Regions:
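Formylglycine-dependent sulfatase
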Residues: 1-133
Length: 133
């Protein structure tokens, strides 16, 4: 494959103040710091919604919550709107999602050529570490 790679890391409940590349001297984030040193960092980034599913749907589609209709975590994104992932995939780029997105279903066209789900989602709840918290 030729061309540039794009890596988007989306983290719930994560503040830039918890990263070494933004000046935190206690929290050690060497891999993210290295990526930030070679890539792009934002000094003013805001979430379109305090609800994780709504924010992910807005990030995926470039639309506001009132446009994508994902008002809460009980109304998951199901790929009904155009997304940057779908556009890249449809132009022969591999688009891979790793982790939980809480989209409605893996059967929906979410725009990813591959989705790697956490064990507790991929195995109908088997493997979820219930006793650890």
């Amino acid at each position: 494959m030729t061309g540039k790679n794009v890596l988007i890391i989306c983290s719930d409940e994560h503040s830039r103040s918890a990263l070494g590349c933004y000046g935190n001297s206690i929290v050690q984030t060497p891999a993210l710091d290295k990526l930030a040193g070679k890539g792009m960092r934002f000094s003013r980034a805001y979430t379109p919604s305090p609800i994780c599913v709504s924010a992910r749907a807005s990030l995926a589609t470039g639309t506001h919550v009132h446009e994508n209709q994902c008002w809460s975590s009980s109304q998951p994104f199901h790929g009904q709107h155009d997304s940057w992932m779908r556009r890249l995939r449809d132009h022969d780029h591999a688009t891979v999602s790793v982790g939980k997105l809480h989209y409605r279903s893996g059967n929906d066209d979410n725009g990813f050529s591959e989705e790697i789900l956490p064990m507790y989602l991929a195995n109908d709840g088997k493997g979820w570490p219930h006793g650890l918290i």
